[in-house]
Structure formats: structure tokens, C-alpha cells
Amino acid sequence: MEHNNIYRSVFKVTHSGGSGSCFYLKNYDLFVTNYHVVEGYRTVAVHDNDRNPYLAKVVLVNPALDIALLAAEGDFSALPEMTLAADDSLTIGRKVYVAGYPYGMPFTITEGSVSSPKQLMDGKYYIQTDAAVNPGNSGGPILNDAEEVVGVTVSKFTQADNMGFGIRVETLHAPVSY
């Protein structure tokens, strides 16, 4: 896995209320994050790994799915493509990677396995992984070995170790096709 492509395409989201993560989808010229990361804000800043800030408008939100799309000012054409996995091919035990900015710190990638590809919580299905997930990772991608986005990091159980969750990729296909 070539981590440099991930490193270049995952950004930090900041606003006066905190921070999270997002990732760039070149085919759509949009950044994807969680709704709860940008809730209450119409504009935010996205920062690359050189800490360059770019103003981004929140252009689409779906609170029920916890997805938000951001349009940032700037030329991102040189960034590598991060593709959405064509379908949900995750199985228990498959290796996944969680990329983002935990606690607002510099970029990290953690590795883990799929604990459950379809964990039902609150009437929705999520990816459950044992990869390290912390506040600030929200909105960042969950990737497979082929560097395809298989999910969007959303939360962890604070009272348990190694229980991170992500929005499944098929949930993401509809909003970005909008």
C-alpha cells in the first residue's frame, strides 16, 4: 500500500468548534466528511499536510447518514485519486486502514481488521473495526489494501477498546452522485 497517496488526499477540517478529517474525491472535486464534524457551519477550513489552509463551503449535508460534502477554494488537480470501492466486499478479518487527524494531531494511519462488515446500530449498518479510532478521525476514510475507500470513520465506543465504526461505502455512493 502506497501511503503517500493517502497522505496527500486526506485533509484536516477545522472551525471554531473543533476539528476532524476529510478526504478528497478527485472525480467529484469535493471533500467528504461527517455531518457531525461540520454541523452548524456553512464554511470551514481544510488543511493539507503542509498545513496550508483552504476555505471550504459545506455544499451538501445529510444528517441522517452523517455525511457532508465540501467544496474548497483551490486547485487540487495534482492530488492522487481516491476511489470509492465499487461495492461492499468487506469480510470479517479483512485488513483495513483508518486515516485522519486524531485529536487534531498530525496525520496518522492505523491498521486493523474488519470485526463486522455490517454491524447494526440505531437502525443503520456500520463497518466495525479494531483499528484505532479517536476523536478527530471522524470524516476520514477507511481504506482497503487497494487504497479504495470502503467507509468513512464515524465513531468509537469510548468505554471499550478497539471498537471503531465507519459508514459503509454504499451509503456514500448516493450523496456524491447528487
Report the location of each language-model feature.
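Short peripheral tails and domain-boundary helices/loops at the edges of structured domains
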Residues: S116-Q128, V176-Y178
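Short, compositionally biased
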Residues: I109-L120, F165-R168
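C-terminal cap/linker of serine protease catalytic domains
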Residues: M1-H3, A56, L65, S77-E81, ...
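A generic structural motif
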Residues: G17, L60-N62, S115-K118, A146, ...
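Short pre-catalytic strand/loop immediately N-terminal to key active-site residues, enriched for Gly-Thr
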Residues: P80, I127-N134
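Conserved active-site neighborhood of the chymotrypsin/trypsin-like protease fold
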Residues: Y7-R8, H15-G20, K26-G100, G104-T108, ...
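Catalytic nucleophile loop of clan PA
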Residues: F23, A132-T153
